[in-house]
A protein has these predicted regions:
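C-terminal accessory/tail domains of diverse enzymes
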Residues: 1-215, 229-385
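Active-site histidine-anchored catalytic micro-motif
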Residues: 219
Length: 385
């Protein structure tokens, strides 16, 4: 019997893993689908990466992902690449002497055995989406970019193992190439929102991963997505900012944040200043929202608040990005329950207290957590009476 689920709110999860040498995220997708009598379809996953071209900040790319459905057609998860997972792959390839003179090639430095595992790159996200819409994730590589080439009425050029499309003036539109060796191994498990039975639902995904020998990579994290709607108020938003600034060290200690995780960071001091100023002046939510939006926050912080800064976000969630990498469902939901209790405290209009001076950060966070859980119990008791 699974352990009682400590988590009670609708939550989506992103769990970063790494396939063993010779396996892939596709292998895990097929294993999970088989265990549920379901199916797997290939989809595109969009992300960005630093550009090696001088003067160009980043490329956008589409890479192969695998969406899993059970026998009823219900989505279980999507498995995608995560470009932050690099150290284990680099270390394995270095140990195997990949790339050295005389090396004959091995599973670590051979491309993905799937001949149609490709990625599409562009420096313009709109063009990338158009390329994906006109190509389709299940297109054979020899036909990749045919669709967007027809849109611009130009040919697809082949340069070695690269397919590319340029407009009539020679400006790059998009290019496609095989997935680099090793990039089939990173596996971010992205779940749909889970309303109940979180531990059991996660174990249905992580059990097969453990059986196949999947690992927690060096840079791994687990991200939580919770409904953003309740946090669209001045008191709630202010409390969230105070939680992730004043109690940052304590949160990292209690949750066990991975110091090697990338694409996280402290909320800027300017945000704290704006929130405190607007709160004291009696600002309403639209005014605070506009003031914070002007700061240009990114998602790559300890907590991603960007969805709260618009009333029509593509994904209406608050994203917590500081849980460590884990391969056990109960470990994940146990830490997620801590986050849930603290965020529910943020919904209480009473201002979140500042950490007491001279008290160690972890101890201060535990005191706040105890208060948050006591408030939870007080809310639950009338319903049980």
């Amino acid at each position: 019997m699974p352990a009682p689920d400590a988590l009670t709110t609708r939550t989506g999860f992103e769990i970063e893993l790494l396939a063993p040498v010779g396996s892939s995220r596709r292998a895990l997708a097929e294993r999970i689908a088989d265990e549920h009598g379901g199916s797997v379809i290939r989809v595109f996953h969009v992300d960005s990466e630093p550009s090696l071209v001088p003067g160009m900040g980043q490329f956008w790319h589409l890479t192969p992902g695998y969406r899993i459905h059970d026998a009823t057609g219900t989505e279980l998860a999507t498995l995608v690449d995560d470009i932050t997972i690099v150290e284990d792959i680099r270390r394995d390839q270095l140990a195997a002497r990949c790339g050295e003179t005389g090396h004959q090639g091995c599973p670590l430095c051979r491309p993905d055995p799937d001949p149609d595992a490709f990625r599409i790159l562009s420096d313009d996200l709109r063009l990338l989406r158009l390329a994906g819409d006109t190509t389709g994730a299940r297109t054979r590589f020899e036909h990749v970019l045919d669709g967007i080439a027809r849109v611009f009425d130009v040919p697809v050029e082949t340069v070695g193992a690269v397919r590319r499309v340029r407009d009539r003036a020679g400006a790059s539109i998009a290019m496609a190439t095989a997935v680099a060796p090793g990039r089939e191994r990173p596996c971010e498990i992205v779940t749909p929102p889970i309303r109940s039975g979180h531990t059991e639902a996660l174990e249905a995904l992580l059990g097969p991963a453990r059986a196949l020998g999947f690992l927690v990579p060096v840079e791994a994290a687990v991200h939580l997505h919770l409904d953003a709607g309740p946090f669209r108020s001045v008191p709630a938003f202010t409390n969230v900012v105070r939680l992730f600034t004043g109690y940052r060290s304590g949160l990292h200690a209690v949750l066990g944040t991975n110091p090697h995780c990338v694409r996280t960071g402290a909320l800027p001091e300017a945000l704290t200043t704006v929130v405190d100023t607007e709160s004291r002046s009696g600002a309403d939510w639209p005014r605070l929202q506009e003031a914070v939006r002007a700061l240009g926050l990114t998602k790559y912080l300890d907590v991603n608040l960007t969805a709260l800064l618009t009333d029509t976000p593509p994904r209406d969630t608050i994203e917590i990005r500081i849980l460590p990498g884990m391969l056990d469902g109960e470990d994940i939901t146990g830490r997620a329950a801590i986050v849930q209790a603290l965020l529910e405290r943020c919904l209480d209009p009473t201002p979140l207290p500042k950490p007491p001076r001279g008290v160690p950060s972890e101890e201060a966070l535990l005191v706040l957590l105890a208060d948050a859980r006591a408030r939870q119990l007080r809310r639950i008791r009338p319903a049980l009476a």
